[in-house]
Structure formats: C-alpha cells, structure tokens
C-alpha cells in the first residue's frame, strides 16, 4: 500500500476527551473516529487490525470444531420475555418498536436467538453435541460509554454457543474453548491470564475470564505464586483462618470517639492495630422479616460485593441501605455501627470470627466499643467468605500465595447448563426416545476490545508497538527525498514490489513530507519493521533497518534484505 493512495489520518495532539492510552493512540493513529457517544467508525488502519484479530479468532474457532453462522443484530422482544431477561436486563438493553408496533431489541448478546434457532432445527441426540459461533456487532446502551473501544456501546464480538445432552461432552467443549481462547491470545503475542470468574447476569456454573494483562486494566486478578490458579478478585476464595480465636484479655468498654468517622481515623487517634477493628456495612435484606442485614469485615479488609450478593439473606442485586433508613433502624449513622446489641441478622467474614478484643462502633453516634469478644459480649454470628483476598495470603490449592495484577477482560466462557434451554423449552429426544432439556455452553470474545487491550499492553512514548500478528502492516518503507532522487525512487519501488511479491504487507511512504513526519507516523501507527532508503545508504549498498519494539538498528545489504524481513516477520 502506498501512503499517497491511503487514508493515513494521523494526529500530533492527544485528544482532550480520550482518557486511556488505547483511546488516545487509536485516535492519533487514525484508526477510529467518533460518531456519537460510544459509537465509532473504523478507518483503514483500524480496520486492518480488527480484521487480523477477527481472522485469528475465526481460525481457532474452526480448528476447535465450532461452526460459523450469522444471527441478526435486531431481535424480537418475545424471546427476551420468554427467558425473563426483558425485565431483568435493565436500560442497557436498547428497545424499540417497528412500524407494526412490535417490540424489538438491539442484541447485546444472542442466547435467546440461538436457543430459539436450535429448538427449531435440532430434534435428535444424533445431531449433538453442536457448537455454533458468529462474529457479529453487539449493542449495549452503556450509561457512560468511556475509554474508546474499551467500553463502547457498539462493538464487535465473537460469541459461540454449544448444545449437549450430557455433562461429559459439555466439559469437553468447554476445555476445547479454553484451549482455543488461549491459542487466540498466544498467537496475537499478548500476555494474558485465564481466571476463575463469577457468571454474572448470564448465569450458569463454571466460568473463566481471559484477561490481557495491563496496568490500566479495570479488573484486579488474584493469582498464585506457585501454581496456575488465578481468579478475578470477585471470585478469589479467601483462606479460612488457621489459628483459633484468642482468649479475651480486655474488658468491654464504651469510648467517646467524636472525630473518628472512619477506620483510618479511629486507628490513628487511638493507636489501634487495624486488624483489631471491624467495619459494619448495612445492606438491604431479601425478606420482609429481615429488611436490613449487617455485613462485617475486618478493618483492613474490603467487602466483596459479588460474594455478598449471593448470600441468601441479602437482597439481590446488592444495595447499601441509605443513611436515613439506617438511623431509623439503629439510631446511629455510618461510622458508629457495630455488632454489639444490633437487632438484625449479622453475617461476618470468616476472619472476623476468630477476632478477640476488637473495636467496633457502639451504634451510638461518636461512640465505639473497645475490647469486644465473641460469646462473651454477643453471640458468634453467622460466618461466610464475604471479603476480597489480599496479597500474600495462601491460595486455595495450597501451592502458593496470592499476588495481584491488573487485567482487561477480553474473553469469557461459561457453562450455562439449562438456564436458557429450560425456560425456552429447548429439548431433544435421547437414544431412548425421551425428551431431554439441552445443556448449553456460552463462549464470548470481544474482538474490537482485543484491539484496544493490545495497545494498552504494547505502547511507548512514540505510539503503538504492535505485536507482529495483528500489526496493520509488517514493514514500512521510508524513502528519503524520493521526489528529488531517481535512485531512491527506483530502489524504493523495487523493494516495495519484492516485499509484496514475498507476501509481506508493506506501507510505502511516498508522500512529499519531511523525514521527521514520516518517521513519526510509522512509529505512531506501530509498524514492526521499517526500512530507510537514502542516497547515503545506496552509496554504501545497504538499507537501514529498524525494529519498532527493540529500537535496534542495523545495516542490511541490498541482496539480503528481503530474506531478512521474511524471517523477521515470521518470528
């Protein structure tokens, strides 16, 4: 491709409204342009990268035995009503009526459509197991689209759905998809981690997320220093206490704490050990008999809202009780709450159950109890794992301790079981002629999100540093003053032809531009290999080669360059 015939829309300045580096660089490199909030057009450079990601995803899905189909982006509301998600999904589901006043949605996902399709097309066990996938545009009406392609409203996704009559084949397909996703990200040259995950609104049992590691990642990953165990912080299991609860050594005493509204203030003012304090959070309960529930974690720990949401006594989705409701029920506000004398269900974290001589709010404004002990000052409360793990704690497999990393979720695989097939009556006849509800798996990859995540992991102060497999072009040719030198023009043109004939994707910068602009553009858009051609190089019989990732420069003889680049691109 010649730049003179190409739409290379680079920008020097960083757009003011671009918060993360991938958004900034995708705009500056001329990959995307904003049409409206969360809606973008792909320019040629961006589309080339997107198509390469898509091709790798498609190849690995086909290799894993999945079959490609295509379903409509517009979906009839009746299917969503059938599964109950018409009411559950919320405002992210964009709903509209056609001219006949029928309800439709723009699909954020396709479980309903694929289940409807399969219940009409598959009737016998002989047609199973079956794994179907598509690469299709999705739409989620995010309340606050941000971060460019990381959290846009419209995005490209690969979603696959498998159907089974038995758990064994469902497990086999799940493992095949796990391997396929690992292959996809490995082929793209990305550092990633598969992690155990919560199933979220889609539901189901087994679930893994695939995260591209990046400092800017929204998700916190807890992984083992001694094994392959890794989990999203929402799912990571806290270790059970190994030491018994210590004996009481302090008397219970009521202390005035007028300036201690937070654990940090309490610890600082009274020189307390933070591990000897607890914080009490009041959430809405699941029943009329218990409209409020107290959740208690150690002062240095954080409540895990996903774990708390799954407690039977807690209303789902989890909702913190407003201060007015708390004051009406307890007589004190946040900052002065604790378990002693609290007239509501109390659920404590396992780590709190072994605490002794600890401090907590006294349920009177500006007062705390010090020296609290279970089974002396109050009954031992129900205990559960309701906190986030912390670095250095032992992992559940016993093979290491927790370490933390940030990641960007780009893939998610689920075992759905019968969540959708049962509500939609998707059944087939088994080998005994009996009707059986289908088991399902669901496997998603954010194709457009991978592009942004790859940039978040691969950039420097000059621009994008693409991994070889998804770079828009492999080689950039930079002829110096080619419009003034016939020698430079002739050699640049010949090299362009030779590399193209060798199957290498080349971008020849044939513009009448200053060398500084040409170099800056090549580095900004992240082409892995550049070749500089000038009169001095020609006199010396060499090309100047530069590797974008390492910055390494070397002179390559004319007759060796094509083979050198073929090897460089392959590696």
UniProtKB/Swiss-Prot annotation:
The keyword Aminoacyl-tRNA synthetase applies. It catalyses: tRNA(Pro) + L-proline + ATP = L-prolyl-tRNA(Pro) + AMP + diphosphate. GO terms for biological process: prolyl-tRNA aminoacylation. It is found in: Cytoplasm. GO terms for cellular component: cytosol. Its main location: cytoplasm. It comes from the Bacteria. InterPro entries: aa-tRNA-synt_IIb (IPR002314), aa-tRNA-synth_II (IPR006195), aa-tRNA-synth_II/BPL/LPL (IPR045864), Anticodon-bd (IPR004154), Anticodon-bd_dom_sf (IPR036621), Pro-tRNA-ligase_IIa (IPR002316), Pro-tRNA-synth_IIa_bac-type (IPR004500), Pro-tRNA-Synthase_IIa_type1 (IPR023717). It is an enzyme of class 6 (ligase). Keywords: Aminoacyl-tRNA synthetase, ATP-binding, Cytoplasm, Ligase, Nucleotide-binding, Protein biosynthesis. Catalyzes the attachment of proline to tRNA(Pro) in a two-step reaction: proline is first activated by ATP to form Pro-AMP and then transferred to the acceptor end of tRNA(Pro). As ProRS can inadvertently accommodate and process non-cognate amino acids such as alanine and cysteine, to avoid such errors it has two additional distinct editing activities against alanine. One activity is designated as 'pretransfer' editing and involves the tRNA(Pro)-independent hydrolysis of activated Ala-AMP. Homodimer. NCBIfam families: PRK09194.1, proS_fam_II. This is Proline--tRNA ligase. It comes from Shewanella sp. (strain W3-18-1).
């Amino acid at each position: 491709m010649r730049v003179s015939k190409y739409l290379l829309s680079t920008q020097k300045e960083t757009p003011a409204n671009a918060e993360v580096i991938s958004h900034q660089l995708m705009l500056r490199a001329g990959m995307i342009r904003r049409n409206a909030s969360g809606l973008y057009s792909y320019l040629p450079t961006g589309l080339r990268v997107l198509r390469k990601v898509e091709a790798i995803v498609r190849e690995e899905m086909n290799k894993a035995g999945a079959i490609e189909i295509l379903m409509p982006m517009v979906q009839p509301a009746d299917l969503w009503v059938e599964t109950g998600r018409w009411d559950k999904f919320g405002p992210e589901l964009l709903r509209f009526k056609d001219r006949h006043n029928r309800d439709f949605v723009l699909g954020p996902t396709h479980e309903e459509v694929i289940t409807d399709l399969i219940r009409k097309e598959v009737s016998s066990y002989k047609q199973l197991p079956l794994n179907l996938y598509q690469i299709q545009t999705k739409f989620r009406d995010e309340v606050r689209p941000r971060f460019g392609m990381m959290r846009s409203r419209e995005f490209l996704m690969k979603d696959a759905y498998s159907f089974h009559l038995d758990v064994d084949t469902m497990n086999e397909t799940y493992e095949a998809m796990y391997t396929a996703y690992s292959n996809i990200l490995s082929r793209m040259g990305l550092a990633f981690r598969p992690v155990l995950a919560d199933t979220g609104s889609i539901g189901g049992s087994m679930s893994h997320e695939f995260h591209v590691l990046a400092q800017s990642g929204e998700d916190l990953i807890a992984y083992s220093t001694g094994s392959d165990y890794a989990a999203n912080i929402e799912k990571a299991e806290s270790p059970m206490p190994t030491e018994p609860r210590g004996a009481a050594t302090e008397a219970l005493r009521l202390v005035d704490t007028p300036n201690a509204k937070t654990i940090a203030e309490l610890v600082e003012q009274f020189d307390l050990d933070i591990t000897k304090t607890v914080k009490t959070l009041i959430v809405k309960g699941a029943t009329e008999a218990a409209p409020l529930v107290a959740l208690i974690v150690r002062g240095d720990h954080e409540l895990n809202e996903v774990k708390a949401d799954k407690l039977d006594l807690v209303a789902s989705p989890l909702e913190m009780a407003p201060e007015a409701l708390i004051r009406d029920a307890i007589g004190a506000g946040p900052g002065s709450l604790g378990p002693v004398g609290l007239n509501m269900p109390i659920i404590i974290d396992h780590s709190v159950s072994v605490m002794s001589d600890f401090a907590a709010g006294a349920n009177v404004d500006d007062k705390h109890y010090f020296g609290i002990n279970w089974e002396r000052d109050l009954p031992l409360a129900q205990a559960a794992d309701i906190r986030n793990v912390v670095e250095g704690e032992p992992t559940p497999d016993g093979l290491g301790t927790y370490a933390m990393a940030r990641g960007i979720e780009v893939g998610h695989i689920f075992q759905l079981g019968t969540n959708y097939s049962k509500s939609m009556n998707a059944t087939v006849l088994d080998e005994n002629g009996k009707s059986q509800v289908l088991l399902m798996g669901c496997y998603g990859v954010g194709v457009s999100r991978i592009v942004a995540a790859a940039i978040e992991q691969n950039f420097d102060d000059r621009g994008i540093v693409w991994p070889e497999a998804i770079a828009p072009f492999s080689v950039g040719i930079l002829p110096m003053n080619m419009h003034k030198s016939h020698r430079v023009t002739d050699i640049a043109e010949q090299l362009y032809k030779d590399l193209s004939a060798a199957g290498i994707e080349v971008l020849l910068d044939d513009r009448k531009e200053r060398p500084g602009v040409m170099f800056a553009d090549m580095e900004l858009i992240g082409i892995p290999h550049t070749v500089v051609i000038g009169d001095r190089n020609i006199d010396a019989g060499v090309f100047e080669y530069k590797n974008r990732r390492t910055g390494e420069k070397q002179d390559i003889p004319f007759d060796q360059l094509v083979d050198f680049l073929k090897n460089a691109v392959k590696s």
